[in-house]
């Protein structure tokens, strides 16, 4: 099924992939991504662990009448940043497993 040395080779590849995944997770944790809303009037920066690092609000939004709109923009900017981090994580995960020669139908445990 796996050919000469197939299972040993598969185990070696799995170990290499596990090491690459560990490195990738460390890299992603260090990433910072900024999401925006309201054409850049609100910016939220988060790290790879989805922790908010910074919120920037354009001074033009700091009036009492726009409080609800500002709250919505902050939430939208955070969601945009979270989506960007998720996309980056998926791209990095795909690059980790792309070089492996896996049997047809083999599913990775992540």
Curated annotation (Swiss-Prot):
InterPro entries: YbaB-like_sf (IPR036894), YbaB/EbfC (IPR004401). It holds the Pfam family YbaB_DNA_bd. It is found in: Cytoplasm, Nucleoid. It comes from the Bacteria. The keyword DNA-binding applies. One of its GO terms (molecular function) is DNA binding. Its main location: cytoplasm. One of its GO terms (cellular component) is cytosol. Keywords: Cytoplasm, DNA-binding. The keyword DNA-binding applies. SUPFAM superfamilies: YbaB-like. Homodimer. Binds to DNA and alters its conformation. May be involved in regulation of gene expression, nucleoid organization and DNA protection. HAMAP family: DNA_YbaB_EbfC. Belongs to the YbaB/EbfC family. NCBIfam families: DNA_YbaB_EbfC. This is Nucleoid-associated protein YE3092.
